[in-house]
A protein has these predicted regions:
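Short, solvent-exposed secondary-structure boundary/capping segments
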Residues: 52-62
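Short, positively charged and aromatic/hydrophobic N-terminal segments
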Residues: 7-23
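Short, small-residue-biased leader/transition segments that mark boundaries at the very start
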Residues: 1-5
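A short macromolecule-binding patch
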Residues: 64-66, 70-80
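Charge/polar-rich, low-complexity and marginally structured segments
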Residues: 80-197
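Short beta-strand-centered aromatic/proline hotspots
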Residues: 41-51
Length: 197
């Protein structure tokens, strides 16, 4: 295994040297990094490899990633296309700063029913935790308003609330090194303790 590993590393280093001269395949992330992928959520980079090392002309360098919530799944993302699809997971400091700003993050409110689901989709695909907070706040407010009117939460609202909440809590859980199930209470406790009278 070690021989194979060192051979793979040598190939990558050699190709990166050539690639850097050509301005392609710049490796931005490292093995062991936690990154956020739209819709999927947080993944750990397990390897950086060529899928076909024998074909230097047509082969691409890939990140091999495993979602933190499904380590059996493998995701391959081309290094050359990673900027638009990946970002580093929040640091612990960034996570606390986000929690601190939650009360001030504007609600992504829209009165256009036809555009609402599209807005939800865009927020989920944006790979931006603030966008997730914005639609979570919006859907929560809509739910409370509908309950006051004797109506149930819509299926679309319920689905995207669950998706957004899962993605947000997953990232905050990894950043804060806490179980995802504890994040909601962590947020509530922090905001309650830091309220300004």
């Amino acid at each position: 295994p070690y021989t194979t590993l060192f051979r793979s590393l040598y190939v990558i280093l050699l190709r990166n040297k050539n690639a850097s001269q050509q301005g392609v395949d710049f490796v931005k992330y490292e093995i062991g990094d936690f990154v956020s992928k739209p819709v999927t959520g947080i993944c750990k980079i397990e390897n950086i490899l060529y899928l076909n090392p024998q074909d230097e002309k047509n082969d691409k360098l890939y990140y091999l990633m495993k979602p933190v919530e499904d380590e059996k799944e493998k995701i391959y993302v081309p290094v050359s296309n990673s900027d638009s699809r990946l970002r580093l997971c929040l640091t612990k400091e960034e996570a606390w700063n986000l929690i601190k700003r939650i009360p001030d993050i504007p609600t992504a409110w829209t009165n256009n029913e036809k555009m609402r689901e599209q807005n939800y989709k865009e927020a989920v695909r944006a790979n931006n935790p603030e966008a997730l907070v914005a639609i979570i706040k919006m859907i929560y407010q809509r739910k409370q308003k509908r309950l006051a009117q004797g109506k149930k939460c819509t299926a679309t609202d319920a689905r995207y609330f669950q998706i957004a909440e899962n993605l947000l809590y997953m990232e905050l859980g990894v950043a804060l090194e806490k179980p995802k199930q504890e994040i909601c209470k962590t947020i509530i406790d922090y905001i309650d303790q830091n309220k300004i009278d």
